[in-house]
Amino acid sequence: MSRAGASLYEVFNIKKPTTGQQTGIEGRVLSFNYYESIYSPMITARLMIEDTGGTIESENGVLGTIKDSMKITGFEEVSFKIVTGNGDLDFTDYPLIVTGSPATKDEPNRQTTVLNLVSKTEMISSSKPLSRNYPEAPISETVTKILNKELKISEDKLDIEKTQNQDKIKGNHLGALDCVLKMCKKSIPADYKDPGYFFFETQDGFKFKSINGLIDEGIKQFEDVDYEYEHTYYYFGALLANLDKNPDRDPNDYKVLLPPMVRRDEDQLQALRNGLYNVRIITKNALTGEYKEVIKNLLSDTNLGEKQQKPVTDEVYFKTYAFHINPGEDDPGVSDKILNNPANYVPQANMRYSLLHSQVVQIQVPCNVQLRAGQVIRLLLENITQGNKVEHVYNELRSGFYMICHLSHVFTPKNSYTSLTLLRDTRELYTSKK
C-alpha cells in the first residue's frame, strides 16, 4: 500500500449514546482530518461525510440522512480504525466525540455534513470543573493526581516528567485539563535547569513533558535503527533510489512532497528586545523590604542543533522583569515562606518557549501514523551548490533535528498524507554537547 495513496477505513461508526443508535459510514467519508499539537491537551478531528438519504431510519421509520435521522447535535461517538501503509490509526476503544456540525450543504439528492470532533476526555473535563484546591506538593505529583483521580485516566496512558519545584494548585472551577495546562509555565524539570513544559494528548495518551526533556528523549530515540528510519525525511528534487534493495521500504515514502515553507526564521533584533540572552530581574520582598537586582544569563544547554551562543556581554540587558514578593500569601496565619517564586521561572520560561520557536517550518509528507506531536524528526534538505554535490549532499545549516509542534493526518478517497509544523531552536545538522 502506497503511503501517499488511499487508506482503508476498516471501521468508521457513528453512535448516539442516548438511544444506542449506530451506523457505519465507511463508504460515505469524503475527508477526515486528524490533529495533534503540543499546545493542545486534546486530540481534535474534522469529518466530512456525504449522504443520499437512504442510510438510516428516523424515530418515525422514515429513511433519511445520518445528520437528520440520528439528530446529530453533539455528544455522539465516532469510532474508527484506518489502515495505512505503516500502521493503523485505531480509535475503536476510545471514540472521539462530536461537538457540533458547523457546516451542512443540502442538495436535491444528497447532503454534505462537516462534524467537529474532540477526545472524550476533553468533554469529561469541560463538564466537571474543579472546585477543590490541591495542597503544596511537587507539581508533577499533583498533575498525576488530577488526571488519574479526577478524569480516571489510567497510569499507562500518562507520561509525566518529574518536577523539582512545588506549588499549591487551585481548581478555580476550571476544567481539569485547563487546570493542568496553567501549570506548564511554572514547572521546572527535575533533571534540567530550564522551566517550561508542554501538556498535550497524542494517540498514545497524555504527556506532561519539559521542553528539554522532549528534545533529549527525541534525539536519543534515533539510537534505534527502526525509529531513525521512520523519523528521517528528505527533500530532494529527484526521486530517491532504494539503495538497500529492501522491497518493504521505499525511500520515497520519506520524501517531503512539497517545498518546505519557512514560517519564521531567526530575528536577532527581536531576540535582543525580548530578553532571549540576558535579562535584569528585580525582586522586592514585602515582608523584609529586601530589594534585589541581578542580570541573569538565560542560555539553554539543551538544543536541537548547535549550542546556543549569545552576541552580547554578560552585563548587557534589554529586558527587565520586576516581581513584588509576598511571603506566606498562600498560607493561613503568619508565614515567611516563599512558594514557587515567579522570579525563578517566568523569565526563564519565556526565554525557553521563545527560543524553541526561533525557526518554524511546515512540510507535507506521505501519511505516517507512527509520528506524534512532541517527537523529534530529522529533516535532510538538499544542498544548493555549484560545487561538489557528492561530498556536500545536505544543507548543513538548515538540515538536522526538528520538533513536531502540530501534526495533521489527512485522508481522502484518493490520498493520505501528513502535514507537520516543525520547531527548532538552533541551527546546524549535528548537535553539540560542548
Predicted regions and their residues:
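Assembly/oligomerization scaffold segments
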Residues: 1-127
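Envelope-exposed proteins and targeting segments
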Residues: 10, 28, 41-45, 92-94, ...
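An acidic/polar, Gly/Ser/Thr-rich interaction patch typically located in mid-to-C-terminal regions
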Residues: 35-69, 227-434
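Glycine-rich, acidic and aromatic/proline-enriched surface loops and short helix-turn segments
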Residues: 111-112, 118-122, 136-157
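Short beta-strand-centered interaction patches in the first periplasmic/extracellular domains
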Residues: 112-115, 119-121, 159-253, 258, ...
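Second-shell loop/turn segments in exported
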Residues: 127-136, 165-171, 360
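Sec-exported extracytoplasmic/periplasmic mature domains
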Residues: 147-152, 184-189, 379
